[in-house]
Amino acid sequence: MEKLTSLLLVAALLMLTQTLIQGGGEDRPNKKFLQKIKSTAKRECTAPSGYCDYPEECCEVECGRHYCDWWY
């Protein structure tokens, strides 16, 4: 009986460990996404038709050919 209890305890521990490992991998992209939203909210951004070097500089539009525009 003690062996069965020990076996069940080990099995439960292994399942818990596997769940925690798999669950942790899924949370990371969400954290990065939310962190990006937070960082863009704190800083100034370039309005449409404004000059840009990187896509992150534009407000709600894309940076194409060094200008923030809806069509890129």
UniProtKB/Swiss-Prot annotation:
Residues making up the signal peptide according to the UniProt record: 1-23
Cysteines joined through disulfide linkages: 45-59, 52-63, 58-68
Propeptide residue intervals: 24-41
Matching InterPro entries: Conotoxin (IPR004214)
One of the record's GO molecular function terms: toxin activity
Coarse class of the protein's main subcellular location: secreted
Alphabetic keyword roster: Cleavage on pair of basic residues, Disulfide bond, Knottin, Neurotoxin, Secreted, Signal, Toxin
Keyword match Magnesium: no
Family: Belongs to the conotoxin O2 superfamily.
Name of the featured protein: Conotoxin LiC53
Lineage: Eukaryota, Metazoa, Spiralia, Lophotrochozoa, Mollusca
